[in-house]
Amino acid sequence: MIMSKDDLIQFTGTVLELLPNATFRVKLENDHVIIAHTAGRMRKNRIRILLGDKVMVEMTPYDLTKGRVIHRH
């Protein structure tokens, strides 16, 4: 079964820690802490994410411990 974009869940969070390979520890609004990597569009356009930035994270309902950073506020 192919997952559509409608199946993804979006949360707003704050970057707590910068990890290697464009990976971040993000604290979501609901106080959960997840690991998130940078989306390809952000990597391609060289958008920098720094400690304390507010970000929009996209997650799959199947694994709520990992996500993808899709927007920086």
UniProtKB/Swiss-Prot annotation:
GO terms for cellular component: cytosol. It comes from the Bacteria. Gene3D superfamilies: Nucleic acid-binding proteins (2.40.50.140). It is found in: Cytoplasm. Keywords: Cytoplasm, Initiation factor, Protein biosynthesis, RNA-binding, rRNA-binding. The keyword Phosphoprotein does not apply. Residues 1-73 form the S1-like domain. GO terms for molecular function: ribosome binding; rRNA binding; translation initiation factor activity. The keyword Protein biosynthesis applies. It holds the Pfam family eIF-1a. PROSITE patterns: S1_IF1_TYPE (PS50832). InterPro entries: NA-bd_OB-fold, RNA-binding_domain_S1_IF1, TIF_IF1. Transmembrane segments: none annotated. One of the essential components for the initiation of protein synthesis. Stabilizes the binding of IF-2 and IF-3 on the 30S subunit to which N-formylmethionyl-tRNA(fMet) subsequently binds. Helps modulate mRNA selection, yielding the 30S pre-initiation complex (PIC). Upon addition of the 50S ribosomal subunit IF-1, IF-2 and IF-3 are released leaving the mature 70S translation initiation complex. Component of the 30S ribosomal translation pre-initiation complex which assembles on the 30S ribosome in the order IF-2 and IF-3, IF-1 and N-formylmethionyl-tRNA(fMet); mRNA recruitment can occur at any time during PIC assembly. Belongs to the IF-1 family. This is Translation initiation factor IF-1. The lineage of its organism: Bacteria, Pseudomonadati, Pseudomonadota, Alphaproteobacteria, Rickettsiales. The gene is infA.
